[in-house]
Swiss-Prot record:
It comes from the Bacteria. Coiled coil: none annotated. Disulfide bonds: none annotated. The lineage of its organism: Bacteria, Pseudomonadati, Pseudomonadota, Betaproteobacteria, Rhodocyclales. This is UPF0301 protein azo3459.
Length: 188
């Protein structure tokens, strides 16, 4: 397969068992953008020891809407870990939004946090600190080295499953049992 021509926007990256980088070992990453210039995504199965209530206190915003306070904040990746990123549906219209498609977007502006805190909109959110980024050709090289499996994204996995079930659910979409994957990859 020519990985150089595959656009992985709105796909999951599943870290192979031999992933050496501890930031990505046993992770499921949602790719929000993939182009000739590189790729950007969020790790969606690594909650931090922080809730939205704590995050909102730290950024000095009220969290009045019900149902959000106990939700975890996620480690989105090793880039800009001091910045918040909100993966959400519906896409909506915010100041700094990367619209992946009509159903999902990635926003990094404060206005979405203000809306979540006051009105609870958008209702389906995954909030992370940091993101995963790849320079031009870097992700393609990692795919060629069998560092990742790819599968089209499923919003139900992101928004409806607890974080500890997301990796297994994505693997099941491929019909693969993670426990049976070899740590040694070969090339035919």
């Amino acid at each position: 397969m020519d990985t150089g021509s595959a656009n992985l926007t709105h796909h999951f990256l599943i870290a192979m068992p031999n992933m050496a980088d501890p930031h990505f070992a046993r992770t499921l990453t949602y790719i929000a953008e993939h182009s000739d210039q590189g790729a950007l995504g969020l790790i969606i199965n690594r909650p931090l020891d922080m809730t939205l209530e704590t995050l909102f206190e730290r950024v000095e915003l009220p969290l009045e809407a019900d149902g959000f306070a106990g939700q975890p904040v996620y480690f989105g990746g090793p880039v800009q870990t001091d910045r918040g990123f909100v993966l959400h549906r519906p896409a909506g219209d915010w100041h700094s939004t990367l619209r992946v498609n009509d159903d999902i977007a990635l926003t990094s502006s404060r206005d979405i946090l203000q809306s979540i805190g006051s009105s609870g909109e958008p209702q389906e959110v995954l909030i992370s600190l940091g993101y995963a980024g790849w320079t031009a050709g870097q992700l393609e090289d990692e795919l060629a080295q069998n560092a990742w499996l790819t599968v089209p994204a499923d919003l139900g996995i992101i928004f409806d499953l607890p974080p500890e079930e997301r990796l297994v659910a994505a693997m099941q979409k491929l019909g693969v049992d993670f426990a049976k994957l070899s740590e040694v990859a070969g090339h035919a």
